[in-house]
Amino acid sequence: MSLHRFLVHSISLISIVLSTTVFAADDEPFITFDSAQLIQGRSLWLDNCKGCHAYGTAGAPIPMYPGDWASRVSKPKATLYDHAINGFFGPDDTMMPERGGNPNLTDEQVKLAVDYMLSLAQHYIDKQP
């Protein structure tokens, strides 16, 4: 095997190992709850909501940041469901698209994802000193 080929294979292997490690660490803050509904909500959230809400894309509130959610967890769930299902223009030019931009999600699926995000946010709020 030539040195060039060896280096290419080595770099590829290192990239695979690092990307797997990053992916595993990336899901770590998204804890799993015991409730069947929250387990289902977590799966929906990871597939549909994480892209914005894990990174603050377009001003999306991050559930792991208590400051982003302290005022939201006290709102009626019906309000949060409505914002997630029908879309919402928030302060500072933030925007929640209808159904997170996935028109195939049912109302019930959106509610499960919202419930998971609320539980995740409350978990991090409760962990504050």
Segments from the language model and where they lie:
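Short, cysteine/histidine-rich loop/knuckle motifs that typically chelate Zn2+
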Residues: G51
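Bacterial N-terminal signal peptides that target proteins for export
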Residues: S2-I11
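Axial heme c-ligation environment in periplasmic c-type cytochrome domains
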Residues: I62, H83-K111, M117-P129
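N-terminal signal peptide c-region/cleavage motif recognized by signal peptidases
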Residues: S19-T21
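Gly/Gly-Pro-rich "capping" loops immediately C-terminal to redox-active cysteine motifs
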Residues: R42, A54-D82, G101-N102
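Cleaved targeting-peptide boundary
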Residues: A24-I31
